[in-house]
A protein has these predicted regions:
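Active-site metal-binding motif and surrounding structural segment of the metallo-beta-lactamase
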Residues: 46, 51-105
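N-terminal short leaders/motifs
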Residues: 1-4, 86-91, 117-121
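Phosphate-binding glycine-rich loops and adjacent basic patches that engage nucleotide phosphates
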Residues: 18-23, 69-80, 124-129, 151
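Solvent-exposed, non-transmembrane amphipathic alpha-helical segments
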Residues: 23-26, 79, 89-94, 124, ...
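Core dinuclear metal-dependent hydrolase active-site scaffold
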Residues: 1-64, 132-175
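Active-site environment of divalent metal-dependent phosphoester hydrolases
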Residues: 79-82, 113, 155-156
Length: 175
C-alpha cells in the first residue's frame, strides 16, 4: 500500500493561527516540514481519507484533482477532518466535467454535518455526491479494499469517531 499523508496536524495546525509559542514561531520561520496542516491522506492514489478545511491547500500543494476520487472515508465530524461546505462545491453549477459520483462514508454524526452543508446551499446533487452511513464493526468494500470501521472516543463524546482498518488482501493499514 502506498500511503500519502497530505496533512498530519490537529485542528489548530502548526503554526497555530493565533499562537505565538516557541514552536509556532519556529515553524513560521523555518516553514517546509515544520508546517503541519490538518489531517488528510490518500491510499494508493485511490482512497481519500478525511476532507478537512485544508483540503484546498492540499490540492494546490500536492497537485491533486479531488474530482478523480470515487470514495471518501470520514473519521469524524470535526472540521479538521470534515469540512462539508467545501465538499458542496462538487455539485453542478460549481464544478464542471466530473464523470463520476463521489461516495462519502461516515457515521450518523458526520451525516448531520454533510446534510447541513447542502441545506446551506438549498439543494443537493445526488449525481455528484452520495452519502453512505457506516456502522461500527460492519466491514464493507471499496474497490479492492475491505474497510473495518472501529468506534473510538474523541473529545467529550463516545463513539462519535471511527478509526479504520483498511485491508487490500496483502497489507493492512490502521488509520
Amino acid at each position: 500500500m502506498k500511503i500519502n499523508y497530505l496533512g498530519t496536524g490537529a485542528a489548530e495546525r502548526i503554526p497555530g493561527i493565533f499562537c505565538n509559542c516557541k514552536l509556532c514561531k519556529y515553524a513560521r520561520e523555518k516553514k517546509g516540514r515544520e508546517i503541519r496542516t490538518q489531517t488528510q491522506l490518500i491510499i494508493d492514489d485511490v482512497l481519500l481519507i478525511d476532507f478537512p478545511g485544508d483540503s484546498y491547500l492540499h490540492l494546490l500543494q500536492y497537485d491533486l484533482c479531488f474530482a478523480d476520487f470515487n470514495s471518501l472515508l470520514i473519521s469524524h465530524w470535526h472540521s479538521d477532518h470534515f469540512y462539508g461546505e467545501d465538499l458542496a462545491y462538487r455539485m453542478s453549477g460549481y464544478a464542471l466535467d466530473i464523470p463520476n459520483r463521489l461516495t462519502v462514508y461516515g457515521n450518523e454524526a458526520v451525516k448531520t454535518f454533510y446534510q447541513r452543508a447542502f441545506d446551506l446551499e438549498g439543494r443537493q446533487d445526488d449525481t455528484r455526491l452520495h452519502y453512505q452511513v457506516i456502522q461500527p464493526y460492519k466491514c464493507f468494500t471499496i474497490a479492492n479494499y475491505t474497510i473495518y470501521p472501529l468506534p473510538a472516543q474523541h473529545g467529550n463524546f463516545s463513539e462519535d469517531c471511527f478509526i479504520f482498518v483498511i485491508d487490500d488482501g496483502k497489507d493492512a493499514f490502521l488509520s
